[in-house]
Amino acid sequence: ALMLAGVLTLGCFPTTVGAVNNAYDGTKPADGTTKKQPFLAGTGGSTNFRIPGLVTLNDGTLVASSDARWNGGGDGGGLDTIVSRSTDNGKTWSYTFANYLGDNGNVHNNGSTAFIDPALTTDGGTVYMAADLYPAGTALNSASYAPKTGHTGYDSQHRLVLAKATDSVTAASDTAQRMNAAFTYYLEKNPDENATSYYLLKDASGNTVSGYTVDAYFNITGNGVNTNLFCGDSPYFPYPTDFIYVTKSTDGGETWSEPTLLDVKKASEQSLLVGPGRGIVISTGEHKGRIVFTCYEFTNGDKN
C-alpha cells in the first residue's frame, strides 16, 4: 500500500533487471572508478554534483547517490542520477549512471528531461532509491518551462496518462500548451510477461495503439520512433508535472531495477518532490518492512 502524509510509504517491489538505455543526443557514460570520493569533479564527464545521499549495508558496502548536473548547477535542464559504491570503507568507489535518458547531450539543456533529488534507504541488503523525473523542458528552474497544476499525471486506476503529439502541441511545447492537450491515452501493463512490449499503449476506448513497443523504462519504439515517452520528440507525452520514480538494487548498488512510478501527487500541487538524503525501512512492529521517504510539495513558490 502507498500512503502520503509528509512521507512516501512504499510496499514491495518485484524482482527486476537493470536498464538498457537508448542513446539520443548523448551517450550514457561508461561505468568507472574514483578514489577517496565518490563524485569528484569530472566523474563520468560531469563537472557538478548536488543532492548527495549515503547508506551503509549490513556487509559494510557504502552506496552513495547524487544529481549529475553536468556543466550546470540549477534544478533542471538535463540532470541525471549517478550512484557510486565502495566495498573498502571509501578508499575506492565504483560508479554507474542509474537514471539516464541522454536527451541532454550530457550538458545543461533547457529542453531536456531531468532526474533530480535522489534519496536512498536500505533494509541492510536491498537499496531503494526515489527520485523526481521531469518531462522534457520542464522544471521549477533552469528549464524552458515551469510544471503545471491541474492533473496528477495518472488516471483513477493509477495508470500514466498520455496525450498524442499533433501539429499544434508536442512533447516539447510550452507547458501552458501541453497542459491543455487531450490526455486520453494511457499505459497499461501487458499481462503477457513474455511479450516484447512491457506496457500497452491504449486509447480512451481501451484499444491498443498498434505499431509501438513500450519497455519497462518508458522507451517507445516502432512506426519510425526510437525515443522515451518523457523526451521532447515522443509521439505521446505525459502531463507537464514531476513524477516520482523509484528503483531498487539487490547487489549493493551495482545494478538497478526497472522503475515504479508512484501516483501520490495531488492535482492542485505544481510539484511533489522527494525530500533528498535518505529514508528509512521500518524494522519492527506492525509495519515492519515498510519503506518511507520524506517529500515536500512546491506550488507557486510555497514549499510545504
Language-model features, listed with the residues they occupy:
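Hydrophobic helical h-region of N-terminal Sec-dependent signal peptides
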Residues: 4-8
